Structure formats: structure tokens, C-alpha cells
């Protein structure tokens, strides 16, 4: 633990030096960061009732879904977890552009197709990709270097610009 603490302290001590020299901090301010939207984790579960009972012990509350269809979404504060039985093979990290943590539609946000174009320009491959010719709800998926799936799933109309 001491070495971890030293590592964090060394990192934190380095930050002002980079900012003062105009290095990484200056470059980061030149481009607006992507706003990926509301984040949740979608878990592939073997027994949805057992998983639901477990997460309820952690004070998660069901906020969406249909238990009879074997999928529910639970929330505790800003943490949101989807439980899905038999719907997909692996766990998925999900970003919902245009949604707040309470599934309220944001007035201004980055459309899923805008996020897709940015990621494509950075060399990331989509599988599947969102149709660039459409507006409104759409999704695309990517995988990180370890094969973890990230889903960008927009449920709301595109922002008016």
C-alpha cells in the first residue's frame, strides 16, 4: 500500500509541472472532450432473481426493465447496473448519449453519430456501426484491446443545432 501511495503522490506532484509548461494540459484544452452520456454496466447473469436479490442487498433499486423478459436495470445514486439473463454472451459497458443518470433527455449533447465519426477518425473500428444518414435513436459498438464491449446507445432524438 505504501508503494501505491508513493506512486499516487509522485503522479500528483507531476501534474502542476506539466500544466505550467504548457504540455499535455494545454493540448487537452484545445479539443473539447467527448461527452459519452450516461454510463452503466450491463451484466450477463445466470440467474436474474439471484442477481437482483444480491444487488438489492447493496441498496440498488429497480428503475426499469421487465423481470418476466429476464432483464432489469438497477440504480444506487449515480451507479446504474443492467442485469440481463440469456441476452448476450459478455458483460457490456454502456454509454447513453443524450440521457442524464435519471434517463432525462438532455437539451444539448453529442449525437451518437458525431461520437462515431470522432472515434473513427482516431482509428477505432465499429462493429456494428450506426447509420450516418439517419437521425435520432441509433447505436454502435466497439471493443477495447482486451475484447471488452462498449455500447454507445442513443435512445432520444438528435439535438437541434
Predicted features and spans:
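Structural preference for beta-strand elements that scaffold enzyme active sites
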Residues: 40, 92-94
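Residue-level recognition of conserved beta-strand positions in structured domain cores
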Residues: 76, 85, 95-97, 154
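Core segments of cupin and vicinal oxygen chelate
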Residues: 35, 42-87
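Vicinal oxygen chelate
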Residues: 46-49, 87-88, 95-149
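Short hydrophobic/aromatic beta-strand element in the GNAT-like acyltransferase core
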Residues: 71, 80, 92, 139-141
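N-terminal beta-strand motif that seeds the catalytic metal site of vicinal oxygen chelate
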Residues: 3-7, 16-49, 155-161
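Short beta->alpha transition motifs characteristic of CBS
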Residues: 65, 84-87, 132, 151-159
Amino acid at each position: 500500500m505504501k508503494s501505491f501511495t508513493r506512486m499516487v503522490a509522485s503522479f500528483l506532484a507531476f501534474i502542476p509541472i506539466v500544466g505550467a509548461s504548457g504540455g499535455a494540459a494545454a493540448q487537452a484544452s484545445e479539443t473539447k472532450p467527448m461527452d459519452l452520456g450516461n454510463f452503466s454496466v450491463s451484466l450477463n447473469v445466470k440467474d436474474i432473481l439471484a442477481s437482483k436479490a444480491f444487488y438489492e442487498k447493496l441498496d440498488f433499486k429497480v428503475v426499469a426493465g421487465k423481470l418476466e423478459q429476464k432483464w432489469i436495470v438497477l440504480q444506487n445514486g449515480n451507479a446504474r447496473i443492467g442485469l440481463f439473463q440469456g441476452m448476450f454472451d459478455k458483460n457490456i459497458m454502456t454509454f447513453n448519449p443524450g440521457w442524464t443518470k435519471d434517463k432525462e433527455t438532455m437539451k444539448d449533447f453529442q449525437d451518437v453519430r458525431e461520437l462515431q465519426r470522432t472515434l473513427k477518425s482516431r482509428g477505432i473500428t465499429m462493429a456494428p456501426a450506426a447509420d450516418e444518414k439517419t437521425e435520432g435513436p441509433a447505436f454502435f459498438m466497439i471493443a477495447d484491446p482486451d475484447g471488452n464491449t462498449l455500447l454507445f446507445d442513443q435512445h432520444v432524438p438528435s439535438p437541434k443545432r
